[in-house]
Curated annotation (Swiss-Prot):
Record's GO cellular component terms: large ribosomal subunit
Alphabetical GO biological process terms: translation
Top-level taxon: Bacteria
Swiss-Prot/TrEMBL keywords: Ribonucleoprotein, Ribosomal protein
Entry-linked InterPro entries: Ribosomal_bL32 (IPR002677), Ribosomal_zn-bd (IPR011332)
NCBIfam families listed in its UniProt record: rpmF_bact
Organism in which the protein naturally occurs: Helicobacter pylori (strain J99 / ATCC 700824)
HAMAP family: Ribosomal_bL32 (MF_00340)
Protein name according to UniProt: Large ribosomal subunit protein bL32
Family designation: Belongs to the bacterial ribosomal protein bL32 family.
Cysteine disulfide links: none
Amino acid sequence: MAVPDRRVSKTRAAKRRTHYSVKLAKPVKAKDGTWKLPHHINKFTKEY
């Protein structure tokens, strides 16, 4: 099992974690004009 040779400083760890943010799904406009999430099936029209 790997063991770190030295402690990672708070600043260095924080710099590494800057890209850990949550990406929100952006809704897209469907053909019928309603908003939906991409890659999800529409309940009413059954379109992908």
